[in-house]
């Protein structure tokens, strides 16, 4: 521990603790980072004493620099730490790790040239576009040579098949990875697929059918001279009866070249498209937007299913213009119909961006509540006859006394006097029952006229008492009539009938049931 701490001492240790781990970060380097770097050097067979000098750090960087692009996170962290230690030994001020790496790179380029490109190995790389053939076939000194596919390309193809499981993305992925390949390379890609052997068998059947069609359309011309290259058959294009050299010669011969690689790729694409339809049985007519599904998710599913459809581009265009709007949910369909005829996809996505979300539901709820809580419209005639409210406190119209903002009036609101309220005001009119509760008779009765020359010896009779006596006598007579038997009442009616004008039907007939039912009884 002590030896490792002796890598940086005094001012150098202080300089280390001022350098940040990341640009703009809070954490800074500590001595524990040097201890960790010394432990990691043992894994690469390097002595930890190399960290004590600038030259030693430069040797470490020379070893680690080629490994950084493909190295692990620990290797990259070790390289960064050594760069910081090198800057401290070289007295180069750095604020953070990135700045230290830049200074190390500039120094190595200027002095040791270690950051230049590593010398190319025996394996050729892809030529720039326009300078030669495609990547699997290279032109070296005027001759075409074959370069096998890299394991990385094969691994990418296998991962694509395993993850997408013959989705619509497999066909364009195969086209990108097999660009410029020979039938030999394409067969390598197909042989790397371990699972999905049912799909592989479908592809083999398609290859056999296409090879038979090729043989039928391109018959053998006849015997060829010795040393002349034969014409490819269907099995030659499939790579089963031809070598890589023959395939390259057919592809790049000066006269009548046959692109066997492109032809074989087209056969494979036909088989992959059949596999896509088999593994994705969903019809585009069944793609419909859910009631709560965002419009963008629905569009993604729609175009994914449309991509798997192997139809004419005109038919796909019709499906996009018709089915995309027709199969949307009612909320989005209402918005899309307002955009006019043939709107663009960008306009549809922008218009339906918030449809179906909580914000749109809240707006619809607010509009519904606003309509429900709105006052009912009053007809014009009823509005004209409507009485205006008058305040008892201030005497103004338009509000009630409960809503009045003026000071409260004291005393009775009717007469303005104190000592009572309006409900008990003596100046109020009498009700229809007569006198009020205070014992004062109403003043709207006519006064009896007294003849001239006569002086009454007694007080005049009150008209109210006379009317009350008359009503009492009339009620007494009605009670007596109700108590009399039926026979006496009938005799009274008969006597009244004899006194009056005779009519067609007598009272006795009226009292009999025959008056109701006629001759039926």
From Swiss-Prot:
Residues 219-226 are annotated as: PPIA/CYPA-binding loop. Residues 8-43 are annotated as: Interaction with host CALM1. The gene is gag. Belongs to the primate lentivirus group gag polyprotein family. A lipid is attached at residue 2 (N-myristoyl glycine). The record marks 135-136, 365-366, 382-383, 431-432, 445-446 as: Cleavage. GO terms for cellular component: host cell nucleus; host cell plasma membrane; host multivesicular body; membrane; viral nucleocapsid; virion membrane. This is Gag polyprotein.
């Amino acid at each position: 521990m002590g030896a490792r701490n002796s890598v940086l001492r005094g001012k150098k240790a202080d300089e280390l603790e001022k350098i940040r781990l990341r640009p703009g970060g809070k954490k800074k380097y500590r001595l524990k980072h040097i201890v960790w770097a010394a432990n990691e050097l043992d894994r690469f067979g390097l002595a930890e004493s190399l960290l004590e000098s600038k030259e030693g750090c430069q040797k470490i960087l020379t070893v680690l620099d080629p490994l950084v692009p493909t190295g692990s996170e620990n290797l990259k962290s070790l390289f960064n730490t050594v760069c910081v230690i090198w800057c401290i030994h070289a007295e180069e001020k750095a604020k953070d790790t990135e700045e230290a790496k830049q200074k190390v790179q500039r120094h190595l380029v200027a002095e040791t040239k270690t950051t230049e490109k590593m010398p190319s190995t025996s394996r050729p790389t892809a030529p720039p576009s326009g300078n030669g053939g495609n990547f699997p076939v290279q032109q070296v000194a005027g001759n075409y040579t074959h370069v096998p596919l890299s394991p990385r390309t094969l691994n990418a193809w296998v991962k694509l098949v395993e993850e997408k499981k013959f989705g619509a993305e497999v066909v364009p992925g195969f086209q990108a990875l097999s660009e410029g390949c020979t039938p030999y390379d394409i067969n390598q890609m197909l042989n790397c697929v371990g699972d999905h052997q049912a799909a592989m068998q479908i592809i083999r059947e398609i290859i056999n059918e296409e090879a038979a069609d090729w043989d039928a359309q391109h018959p053998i011309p006849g015997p060829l001279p010795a040393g002349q290259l034969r014409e490819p058959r269907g099995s030659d294009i499939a790579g089963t009866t031809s070598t890589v050299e023959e395939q390259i010669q057919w592809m790049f011969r000066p006269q009548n070249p046959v692109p066997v690689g492109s032809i074989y790729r087209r056969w494979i694409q036909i088989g992959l498209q059949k596999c896509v339809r088999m593994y994705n049985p969903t019809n585009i007519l069944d793609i419909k937007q859910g009631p709560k599904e965002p419009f963008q998710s629905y569009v993604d599913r729609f175009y994914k299913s449309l991509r798997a459809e192997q139809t004419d581009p005109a038919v796909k265009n019709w499906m996009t213009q018709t089915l995309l709007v027709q199969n949307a949910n009612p909320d989005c369909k209402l918005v899309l119909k307002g955009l006019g005829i043939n709107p663009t996809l960008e306009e549809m996505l922008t218009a339906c961006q918030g449809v179906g979300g909580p914000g749109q539901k809240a707006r619809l709820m607010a509009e519904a509540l606003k309509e429900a809580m709105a006052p009912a419209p009053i007809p014009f005639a009823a509005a004209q006859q409507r009485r205006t409210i008058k305040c008892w406190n201030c005497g103004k119209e338009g509000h009630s006394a409960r809503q009045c903002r003026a000071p409260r009036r004291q005393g009775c609101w009717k007469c303005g006097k104190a000592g009572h309220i309006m409900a008990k005001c003596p100046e109020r009119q009498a009700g229809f029952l007569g006198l009020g509760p205070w014992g004062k008779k109403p003043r709207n009765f006519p006064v009896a006229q007294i003849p001239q020359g006569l002086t009454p010896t007694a007080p005049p009779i009150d008209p109210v008492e006379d009317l009350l006596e008359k009503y009492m006598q009339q009620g007494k007579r009605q009670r007596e009539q109700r108590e009399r038997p039926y026979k006496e009442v009938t005799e009274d009616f008969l006597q009244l009938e004899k006194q009056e004008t005779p009519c067609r039907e007598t009272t006795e007939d009226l009292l009999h049931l025959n008056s109701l039912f006629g001759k039926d009884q």
